[in-house]
A protein has these predicted regions:
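A domain-start/cap signature at the N-terminus of enzymes
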Residues: 23-88, 169, 174, 234-245
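Short alpha-helix in the alpha/beta-hydrolase fold that links the catalytic acid
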Residues: 104, 218-235
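C-terminal catalytic histidine-bearing segment of alpha/beta-hydrolase fold enzymes
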Residues: 209, 213-215, 232-285
Length: 285
């Protein structure tokens, strides 16, 4: 090959090698960034419901390895996209709202899940439908709370709960086991079945409300629970002013129910969902 031809061949080969190198060093195409994990439920853990009621998706099921299938209704504001932390509210119903009474029956029997929306429009509301008011349901409530705290963008300082009647029994057991999961608790027309010491240790504010002549429980168990927590706080050295910020005892007289058209003090517990002083206290914590 002549010198000139050899030179041209060398230049051509070098140019081809440079071109191949440029192609191989080009940045690979970028994959789209997946949405944050907190914006949607884990499909492997949850079967989503297909029915709705006034903004709630009904009969979702959390499949817990330890606690079995946990049925719940949930309201997630349309504005929630996982980019900012939202509050979280659990409302546990009385006997008439348990799962065997029918899907969504708790939302038809009680208004807590609806009136709560007036206090914070950036709040996810969970309305479980459990099967009893004992240890099993308490453990399922804890598992459900842990699921929402782990899979949604939740402000840990704004995690609220109420329990009405049997739901209050369940929620008091939860408070006796894992009070640190919650910011404040509203105990309505019920009795306290859980331990007291964990509540005192965690300094969880509790509001007790019941009719003075509640037909199912009477007001005595509520008074006793308040007194027990109060005594423990005194032992801890808290002042009355400090205790008053953590404990509220609100025993309603007969007129409270009669004036609002309720013939029953126990059944009239749903009135508490519409009481701005009570609900305002909960969501003001």
């Amino acid at each position: 090959m002549a010198p000139l031809e050899r030179l041209l061949a060398f230049v051509l080969a070098a140019a081809m090698q440079t071109g191949l190198g440029a192609c191989s060093s080009a940045a690979p195409p970028q994959e789209s960034t997946p949405p944050p994990a907190e914006t949607q439920p884990d499909d492997s853990l949850v079967t989503e419901g297909t029915q709705t009621d006034r903004g709630f998706v009904l009969d979702n099921v959390l499949h817990s390895e330890a606690e079995g299938d946990i049925h719940y209704n949930v309201y997630i504001p349309e504005t929630y996209d996982g980019s900012e932390p939202y509050a979280l509210y659990f409302t546990l119903p009385g006997y008439e709202g348990l799962y065997f009474q029918g899907v969504g029956e708790n939302l038809r029997q009680e208004d807590f899940g609806f009136t709560a929306q007036q206090y914070n429009d950036r709040m996810i509301i969970v309305a479980p439908q459990l099967s009893d008011w004992g240890e099993t349901s308490a453990d399922q409530t804890i598992a459900l709370a842990e699921y929402f705290l782990g899979h949604y963008n939740i402000d840990p300082d704004k995690v609220y709960a109420n329990g009405y009647s049997g739901g209050g029994e369940t929620m008091s057991l939860v408070m006796g086991k894992r009070p640190e999961l919650f910011t404040a608790y509203l105990h309505c027309s019920s009795r306290w079945d859980g331990a007291y010491e964990p509540v005192v240790k965690s300094r969880i504010p509790v509001y007790f409300v019941i009719g003075e002549s509640d037909e199912y429980y009477g007001s005595e168990p509520t008074q006793e629970a308040y007194d027990a927590l109060h005594a423990l706080y005194v032992q801890e050295g808290l002042s009355e002013e400090e205790i008053d910020r953590l404990l509220v005892l609100d025993i309603k007289d007969a007129a409270y129910f009669e004036e609002q058209g309720s013939p029953s003090q126990h059944g009239g517990g749903n009135l508490f969902a519409h009481d701005a002083q009570i609900m305002g206290w909960l969501f003001g914590q």
